[in-house]
């Protein structure tokens, strides 16, 4: 064997095994959810949960970083979203929390840090509330830009609305649901800074359209009228709340969530840090650093 061939063969034998995997989890009501795992099999576990209408693919900048840094990374598409099955039932937060529980159990995820964006945080809060017997599976929570109450009570004072950064009025929720097809592009664009490229915006918009407008409307109505304020004080694991100065969700009310969680911490991405609702996409280097610093502290 020639020396070059011998060296090539030796290097090939030393190449780390590809541990990336894509599979399906079947929920208790028979829906198949698409998931991916990457990174070392024995690495610290981290699970990324997308927001309303979003997909696992939108976490790709986090998957690339954390899997390369030695973490075992799991992402999944919620029912009706992304590459998962798209039934005509189950579009409510309680069902999505049950789906999350099925995923955790079937993949046997333990000592896992959950990073949840937007509605993914609501799903995590619902899961914490509904499945107390499974709480020891989770080591850390990172809640990204989600209000504890999305829709303001019409009888609230302005101060009460600001305290929780309620984004909608009741009529506003139903208007969004009714006009879903036309409302989606401007609504998605409002979640980014002006610096997002048109190619990136169109790609994210295409991800949003992987769930039907009908099912997205049903889901947002259920999501928008949930109130998680009584759940927050019962979270007893390390939790970080991330807000954005440029987000559609006013940062003070998002950071307020951390004050309701015992020992909760908060970090607000500034304008200079591209602190939009999608700061993890627009400033992945800073976002990944903040998350990793928290879960390893």
Language-model features, listed with the residues they occupy:
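Short helix immediately C-terminal to the catalytic nucleophile in hydrolase catalytic domains
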Residues: 120, 124-128
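Conserved HGGG/HGGXW glycine-rich cap/lid loop of the alpha/beta-hydrolase fold
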Residues: 31, 36-86
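Flexible "cap/lid" loop of the alpha/beta hydrolase fold
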Residues: 125, 133-175
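Alpha/beta-hydrolase active-site loop signature
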Residues: 53, 78-82, 121, 148, ...
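Active-site loop/oxyanion-hole signature of alpha/beta-hydrolase fold enzymes
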Residues: 28-31, 68, 75-119, 132-135, ...
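Conserved loop-alpha-helix segment in the C-terminal half of the alpha/beta-hydrolase fold
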Residues: 236-275, 281
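Alpha/beta-hydrolase fold catalytic core
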Residues: 1-46, 68-71, 109-110, 136, ...
């Amino acid at each position: 064997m020639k020396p070059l061939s011998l060296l090539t063969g030796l290097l090939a034998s030393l190449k780390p095994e590809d541990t990336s995997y894509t599979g399906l989890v079947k929920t208790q009501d028979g829906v198949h959810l698409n998931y991916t795992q990457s990174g070392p099999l024995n690495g610290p576990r981290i699970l990324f949960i997308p927001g309303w209408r979003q997909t696992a693919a939108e976490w790709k900048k986090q998957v690339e970083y954390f899997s390369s840094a030695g973490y075992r990374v799991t992402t999944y598409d919620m029912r009706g979203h992304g590459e998962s099955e798209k039934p005509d039932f189950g579009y409510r937060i309680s069902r999505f929390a049950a789906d999350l529980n099925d995923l955790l159990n079937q993949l046997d995820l333990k000592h896992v840090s959950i990073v949840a964006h937007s509605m993914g945080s609501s799903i995590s809060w619902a899961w914490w509330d509904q499945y107390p017997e499974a709480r020891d599976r989770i080591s850390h929570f990172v809640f990204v830009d989600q209000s504890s109450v999305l829709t303001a009570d019409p009888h609230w004072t302005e101060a009460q609305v600001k305290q929780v950064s309620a984004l909608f009025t009741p009529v506003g929720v139903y208007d969004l649901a009714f006009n879903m097809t036309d409302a989606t592009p401007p609504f998605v664009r409002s979640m980014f800074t002006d610096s997002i490229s048109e190619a990136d915006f169109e790609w994210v918009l295409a991800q949003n359209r992987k769930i039907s407008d009908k099912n997205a409307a049903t889901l947002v109505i259920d999501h928008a009228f949930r109130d998680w304020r009584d759940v927050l004080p019962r979270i007893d694991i390390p939790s970080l709340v991330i807000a954005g100065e440029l987000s559609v969700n006013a940062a003070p009310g998002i950071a307020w969530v951390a004050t309701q969680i015992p020992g909760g911490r908060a970090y607000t991405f500034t304008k200079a840090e591209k602190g939009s609702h999608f700061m993890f996409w627009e400033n992945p280097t800073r976002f990944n650093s903040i998350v990793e610093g928290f879960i390893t502290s």
